[in-house]
């Protein structure tokens, strides 16, 4: 493949003079390019919605969401995966981020790690890939061998696969059941896909993981009601969520949270129904953890 033909590798005619600009002009030029990202992502929303539904289906069937990529793309997957346990109270390992070259590549580039299709397959084998897992391949270029190898193995294993690329009709798109391709255009700095392409990928991952968790019962209204209150800031947030969801006072919210070990969902259910902590937990369990369903039935 001639990489110079990729949209993400071509020169941007709007930024040919970066080295001659004043600092205010320089950052304005970057910002002008960044405004294009949201519209590019908007054009992919039907495919993102399919990916959200696939991710939710994977979780409901006992599977995992597995991101895999190299360089910036891999780091973005690891970032999104690492935020899911504290935000949604899910176990570590339910959302997984794989980066070519292994964990060391998060901090320091591992040269050539992305060039092996076999490495992508091997990393999924090491995770004991199951057919109920969802595998999301991330590559701004859309042609990273590590990702191609992983997606190909995942499909052969019966998994649903998603490809996120910033070039149209990419090789990884052809390996996936669902292709998400926000075409953000040439980067302000030629070929530096940590810029617009990285931003677009982050926006897509935000929607996939958050949307899946909404459909997995981890959200009530727009509150992260399965959040783990593991520090002072989060204890305060837990109190505020109970107050905002129920209209009770803060002191009463704190009393209820102490009875639930600072679990927000049963505290809200207790406040709105009068149930005790044990009965609230039992009712939530009967509705697969969906707070709205527990309140309405």
Curated annotation (Swiss-Prot):
Q: Which PROSITE patterns match?
A: GCKR (PS01272), SIS (PS51464)
**Protein's UniProt keywords contain Lyase:** yes
Q: What InterPro entries does this protein map onto?
A: Etherase_MurQ (IPR005488), Glucokinase_regulatory_CS (IPR005486), MURQ/GCKR (IPR040190), SIS_dom (IPR001347), SIS_dom_sf (IPR046348)
Q: Does the keyword Plastid apply?
A: no
Top-level division of the source organism's lineage: Bacteria
In this protein, the active site sits at 83 (proton donor), 114
- UniProt keyword list: Carbohydrate metabolism, Lyase
* Catalyzed chemical reaction(s): N-acetyl-D-muramate 6-phosphate + H2O = N-acetyl-D-glucosamine 6-phosphate + (R)-lactate
Residues covered by the SIS domain? 55-218
Any other noteworthy remark? A lyase-type mechanism (elimination/hydration) is suggested for the cleavage of the lactyl ether bond of MurNAc 6-phosphate, with the formation of an alpha,beta-unsaturated aldehyde intermediate with (E)-stereochemistry, followed by the syn addition of water to give product.
State the similarity comment: Belongs to the GCKR-like family. MurNAc-6-P etherase subfamily.
- Subunit organization: Homodimer.
Q: What role does it play?
A: Specifically catalyzes the cleavage of the D-lactyl ether substituent of MurNAc 6-phosphate, producing GlcNAc 6-phosphate and D-lactate. Together with AnmK, is also required for the utilization of anhydro-N-acetylmuramic acid (anhMurNAc) either imported from the medium or derived from its own cell wall murein, and thus plays a role in cell wall recycling.
Q: Which NCBIfam families match?
A: N-acetylmuramic acid 6-phosphate etherase (TIGR00274), PRK05441.1 (NF003915), PRK12570.1 (NF009222)
User: What name is this protein filed under?
Assistant: N-acetylmuramic acid 6-phosphate etherase
- This protein's species is Salmonella typhi
Give the gene name: murQ
